[in-house]
């Protein structure tokens, strides 16, 4: 139905090509019959407008990075589609028509303007490999969420980024991969919205976590940069270290690693080595390098919703000895995966 003051009525949206052909064939036959009987043509002023839809040929691949466009193409949701929406959408064309006094159809066409093309750094082959192994992990040991980033260390380009909660970009509101039909039917609008946003989230950018052992490389790097260690030092690991009234354990908590060099500490993921190094650094230098390495700061990646972890990082002013110790091996503070990468 059209508006009362409208000069035309939009009769139907999203007609199939078969429906269009059927109408054209039938209207042509009827108009020919009217002409044959010397009657004025009765079916006039009807035309069809092409509608373009964004199609994602790779389905769920890199879905949390790409995001999706709404059906009418007016807005992007999540990922690149949302971040670059204003560059991607372009302007829709329009075709207007009116009947002249002698019942001839006149048309006015306003051409469409294409949006810009965005090329990502995602390597499809690497992306599929990431997704394959995340799927295997989830099918085996499993976790609430699993994620991975593959970055070119020379340029910072993201070659792959995956979160285990994937969805089909061509059908982004389909929850059947995570909920039964009975569960979906029982959801109200709020519950459905929460389920959708949970499925669409990009853990690598939108969420924070305790990074754990990858932090150890940064602890060593800061100490070496300040000439506090040179890498030849050896530390004794007995499975724990008493700091600030706490026995803080190593991964080898029963017997420890024994005498362990800095390099061995990285190879064996020794917490005691890291705690000793951070104690040599002190809170001022350790906090300084946390900032230099970008922890607690947004990276500015061109994806929406990057989490702010500024309040989840210790400063030199509020860092106690036990905080320093646990931070040295990536616990007791949060960052995003993209910050860690």
Feature annotation, model-predicted:
Residues 7-12, 147-148, 274-280:
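Conserved short loop/turn motifs at secondary-structure junctions
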Residues 13, 21, 25, 59, ...:
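Solvent-exposed, polar/charged alpha-helical surfaces in well-ordered, non-transmembrane soluble domains
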Residues 43-47, 139-153:
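Short N-terminal helix-loop-first-beta-strand/juxtamembrane motif that initiates sensory/input modules
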């Amino acid at each position: 139905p059209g508006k009362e003051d409208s000069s035309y009525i939009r009769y139907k949206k999203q007609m199939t090509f078969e429906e269009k052909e059927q109408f054209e064939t039938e209207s042509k036959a009827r108009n020919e019959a009217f002409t044959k009987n010397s009657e004025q043509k009765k079916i006039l002023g009807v035309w069809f407008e092409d509608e373009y839809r964004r199609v994602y040929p790779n389905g769920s691949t890199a879905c949390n990075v790409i995001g999706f466009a709404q059906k009418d193409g007016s807005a992007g949701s999540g990922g690149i589609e949302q971040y670059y929406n204003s560059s991607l959408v372009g302007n829709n064309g329009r075709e207007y028509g009116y009947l002249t006094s002698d019942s001839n159809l006149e048309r006015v066409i306003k051409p469409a303007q294409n949006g810009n093309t965005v090329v990502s750094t995602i390597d499809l082959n690497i992306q599929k490999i990431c997704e394959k192994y995340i799927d295997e992990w989830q099918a085996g040991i499993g976790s609430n969420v699993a994620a991975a980033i593959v970055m070119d260390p020379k340029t910072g380009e993201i070659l792959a980024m995956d979160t285990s909660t994937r969805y089909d970009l061509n059908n982004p509101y389909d929850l059947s991969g995570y909920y039964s039909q009975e569960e979906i039917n029982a959801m109200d609008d709020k519950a459905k919205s929460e389920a959708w946003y949970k499925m669409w989230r990009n853990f690598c950018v939108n969420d924070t976590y305790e990074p754990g052992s990858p932090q150890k490389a940064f602890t060593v790097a800061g100490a070496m940069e300040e000439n506090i260690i040179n890498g030849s030092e050896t530390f004794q690991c007995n499975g724990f270290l008493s700091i600030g009234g706490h026995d803080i354990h190593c991964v080898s908590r029963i017997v420890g690693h024994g005498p362990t060099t800095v390099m061995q500490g990285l190879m064996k993921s020794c917490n005691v080595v890291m705690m000793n190094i951070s104690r040599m650094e002190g809170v001022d230098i350790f906090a300084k390098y946390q900032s230099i390495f970008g922890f607690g700061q947004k990276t500015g990646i061109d994806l929406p919703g990057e989490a702010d972890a500024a309040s989840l990082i210790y400063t030199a002013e509020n860092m106690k000895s036990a905080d320093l110790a646990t931070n040295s091996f990536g616990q007791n503070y949060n960052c995003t995966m993209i910050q860690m990468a």
